[in-house]
């Protein structure tokens, strides 16, 4: 137990330093325009505490009017395209803690894989993210959405499945973190990925896919409206 606590505080120390010195994290300014857009929105009207915070990469960032899919919940989407799970560790205080969420929905890590980050590293970063939540936002429930397959990147599907399995097994007994499968709904009865669930790039989900995701996610959301 003491060893685990020491590791956590070491990670906090590293990321706090990174917040002070951008040069210590090589992706400190990655996709800065998207982040600045969110920060500008916040300056005009900062979201009130207690939202269900959706964060992650483009599969969530491109989910337009997310709240309309969940009319019985108050949702805040701060996902952005191209993000890695390590980016959310770096921007943790500003993109997560600052909003004082009542619940978090996370879908992130696939971009890390696509850029050469190992399966083990992605898994460790996701665990680190959840450990930080346990410290700064104790008791706040977290939904970890499964990495979804894309027809345009079939070679990556086995790696995505492996990460999904690691996450599912690791958090199966957690009272705070819930793994939710949004992968299975994208396959037809023949095991194929219908084009209707993807936009023209065959990478990102379509409106039809988001409707399916919403049906799966909604039962896991807290009542916060």
Feature locations, PLM:
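Conserved beta-strand elements of the Class I
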Residues: 53-55, 76
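Catalytic His-Asp segment of secreted/periplasmic serine-dependent ester chemistry enzymes
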Residues: 151-225
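N-terminal secretory targeting modules
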Residues: 1-53, 64, 68, 224
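Extracellular/periplasmic catalytic domains that process cell-envelope and extracellular macromolecules
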Residues: 45-48, 69-70, 98, 136, ...
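A short helix->loop->beta-strand "cap" motif at the edges of active sites that frequently abuts
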Residues: 137-141
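Oxyanion-hole/transition-state-stabilizing segment in secreted/luminal serine hydrolases
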Residues: 60-69, 74-76, 85-123, 143, ...
